[in-house]
Structures are given as structure tokens and as C-alpha cells.
């Protein structure tokens, strides 16, 4: 069904109420590779029983963490087949460290919808607040919908992420476990693209790929561990664009540049001619 811009743009979804526990946080951070050295206190700080420190990227998944069915893309004025949708970008901003357990209310609205001709880019913003109205985090997301352009909307900006023209200040090896996608799917993303070899083959991939949000969260953790002394509370904002795929079992490289107070990065796959997996990575310290 074509996108109905008059209905979709500015539409606000019904509020979603949800809660999470320290066990959810532990599982999420295990899914990102926390605990790779079970004797390292810094790794164990992500997995403490009642008070794990919480990476801000947990805010990107908290509202859907307990879903056990594949997601749908059906919203006011928007009805798109999941197989046509690619995750384009993600960002989270936190005014204060996230608690290891709690309850929240999330409200999502569609902020921009761009007509790229053969595709559409749909941008949304979600605010999560405590039951008494305190802002916990703001999440911004864009998706790329193949075959959904041509509805008469504005083309919008062209995203371009150019890494600094100098050698990175730091390079971090980021190994992906062979079973990492199977573990991360327990964090609320049951898209079979990440677990079913036949589904992945039908989508054009040689094997299931890693969730983009897993690579996204792993990269945040890698930068926090390398440059912020493994202190998840030192992050005020973090975001990235999804430029390519990652496969379980490979090792990625995180290239990090210091840019004033910001840390900017890209993620590449060295065994695939440095194919770019994430671009425009930005971490803003608190």
C-alpha cells in the first residue's frame, strides 16, 4: 500500500507502557559480548546481579525487549512488508544514566518521510518517560523502505558520512561470536533474517546476518571500554548509520577519531576488503 503522507507525517502512535529488570539488562549486554573475560571486573560491571551499569543503547531496545514475534511495519498511513525494510540509522540521547530496572511510557511520532524515488526514508522519534513524567531517553530512528517511493513527497537531505582525513586515533578489534545473533535475538528482535539460513538465502545473503542494533550496541561498548574507562554513565548521546552487514563469527574493526569532545568512528570488516558496516558513528560524552 502506498504511503499516505497526509496521514503518516506527524502521526503519533499510541503510548507503550513497559518495564525491565536487571536480568533484562544483563541479557542485553551479554548479547553484545559483555563478560568475554569473566575475570575482568570491568566486564563484570555490565553483568552484576542487581546493579549492572547500563549502556545507553539499552534504551533503543527496552520497549520491545520482551517481544517474541517478528516486527511489523504497519502504522497510520504506512503498511510495508518487512522484507522491504532496511534499518538506516539509530540514535539515543540520555539526560542521566539509565537505571538497571524500572518502568516507562514510550511515545513515538513520525518526524520526516522522504521520497527517494524508488524508496522511502521514514524517520521517527520516541521519548521514554518514567510514570511520573521524568525523561529517561530520546530515541531517533530511520528506516529505508525499498519500492515505497514515488508518493509525491520531498526528496529530503542526502546522508553522507565522511570519516576524518587522517589515520584513526585508535583501532579496536571487535570479534563476533558464531552464536551471537542467536543470543541477541532473545532481546526482542526475532526477525528470521538473523536466525534462519533459508530465509537469509531468500533475502540474498549467504547466511544469517547479525542484527544491526547488535553491531550498534557492540560498537558503543567497544568505544566506552577503550576510551571511557568502561564507564557507561559517561555517555550522553550515541548514534550511527547502518551501511552494511556483519556476519557472526567474523571480527570487525572499530576506527575511532577524537573530534573535540566527541568521539567519531566507523566500523569495517577487514576480511571483506574493509566493507563498511557502520558509518557516522558518534559518541557524545556526558
UniProtKB/Swiss-Prot annotation:
InterPro entries, per this entry? HotDog_dom_sf (IPR029069), MaoC-like_dom (IPR002539), MFE-2_N (IPR054357)
GO BP field? cholesterol catabolic process; fatty acid beta-oxidation
Spell out the Pfam families in the cross-references: MaoC_dehydratas (PF01575), MFE-2_hydrat-2_N (PF22622)
Q: Which UniProt keywords apply?
A: Cholesterol metabolism, Lipid degradation, Lipid metabolism, Lyase, Steroid metabolism, Sterol metabolism
Keyword Protein transport part of the UniProt annotation: no
Where would I find the MaoC-like domain in this sequence? 163-271
Catalytic activity of the protein? (22E)-3-oxochola-4,22-dien-24-oyl-CoA + H2O = (22S)-hydroxy-3-oxo-chol-4-ene-24-oyl-CoA
State which Enzyme Commission number(s) the record gives.
4.2.1.-
Question: What do the Gene Ontology cellular component annotations say?
Answer: plasma membrane
Query: Which residue positions are annotated as catalytic?
Result: 189, 194
What GO molecular-function term can you cite, just one?
3-hydroxyacyl-CoA dehydrogenase activity
Pathway it works in = Steroid metabolism; cholesterol degradation
Enzyme class, broadest EC rank: lyase
Specify whether Lyase is a keyword of the entry: yes
What phenotype has been reported when the gene encoding this protein is knocked out? Not required for growth in a mouse tuberculosis model. Required for growth on cholesterol.
How does it associate, per the subunit comment? Homodimer.
Role of this protein: Degradation of the cholesterol side chain involves 3 multistep beta-oxidation cycles, this is involved in the second cycle. Hydrates bulky steroid enoyl-CoA esters, has highest activity with 3-OCDO-CoA (3-oxochol-4,22-dien-24-oyl-CoA) making (22S)-HOCO-CoA, followed by octenoyl-CoA, with weaker activity on 3-OCDS-CoA (3-oxocholest-4,24-dien-26-oyl-CoA) and none on 3-OPDC-CoA (3-oxo-pregna-4,17-diene-20- carboxyl-CoA). Hydrates the same substrate as EchA19, but the 2 enzymes make different stereoisomers of the product.
Which family is this protein grouped under? Answer: Belongs to the enoyl-CoA hydratase/isomerase family.
Instruction: Return the protein name.
Output: Enoyl-CoA hydratase ChsH3
Q: Organism source for this protein?
A: Mycobacterium tuberculosis (strain ATCC 25618 / H37Rv)
Amino acid at each position: 500500500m502506498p504511503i499516505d503522507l497526509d496521514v503518516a507525517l506527524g502521526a503519533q502512535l499510541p503510548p507503550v507502557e513497559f518495564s525491565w529488570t536487571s536480568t533484562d539488562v544483563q541479557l542485553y549486554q551479554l548479547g553484545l559480548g559483555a563478560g568475554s573475560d569473566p575475570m575482568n571486573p570491568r566486564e563484570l560491571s555490565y553483568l552484576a546481579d542487581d546493579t549492572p551499569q547500563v549502556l545507553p543503547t539499552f534504551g533503543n531496545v527496552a520497549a520491545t525487549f520482551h517481544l517474541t514475534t517478528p516486527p511489523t511495519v504497519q502504522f497510520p498511513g504506512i503498511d510495508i512488508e518487512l522484507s522491504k525494510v532496511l534499518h538506516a540509522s539509530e540514535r539515543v540521547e540520555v539526560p542521566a544514566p539509565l537505571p538497571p530496572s524500572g518502568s516507562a511510557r514510550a511515545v513515538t511520532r513520525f518526524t520526516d518521510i522522504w521520497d527517494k524515488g524508488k524508496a522511502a526514508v521514514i524517520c521517527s522519534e520516541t521519548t521514554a518517560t518514567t510514570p511520573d513524567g521524568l525523561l529517561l531517553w530520546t530515541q531517533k530512528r530511520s528506516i529505508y523502505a525499498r519500492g515505497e517511493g514515488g508518493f509525491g513527497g520531498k526528496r529530503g537531505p542526502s546522508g553522507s558520512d565522511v570519516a576524518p582525513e587522517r589515520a584513526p586515533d585508535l583501532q579496536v578489534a571487535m570479534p563476533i561470536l558464531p552464536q551471537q545473533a542467536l543470543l541477541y535475538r532473545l532481546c526482542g528482535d526475532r526477525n528470521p533474517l538473523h536466525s534462519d539460513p533459508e530465509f537469509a538465502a531468500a533475502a540474498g545473503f549467504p547466511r544469517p546476518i547479525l542484527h544491526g542494533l547488535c553491531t550498534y550496541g557492540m560498537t558503543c561498548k567497544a568505544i566506552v571500554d577503550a576510551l571511557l574507562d568502561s564507564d557507561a554513565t559517561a555517555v550522553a548521546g550515541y548514534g550511527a548509520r547502518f551501511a552494511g552487514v556483519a556476519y557472526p563469527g567474523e571480527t570487525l574493526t572499530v576506527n575511532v577519531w577524537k573530534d573535540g569532545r566527541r568521539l567519531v568512528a566507523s566500523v569495517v570488516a577487514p576480511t571483506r576488503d574493509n566493507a563498511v558496516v557502520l558509518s557516522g558513528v558518534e559518541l557524545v560524552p556526558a
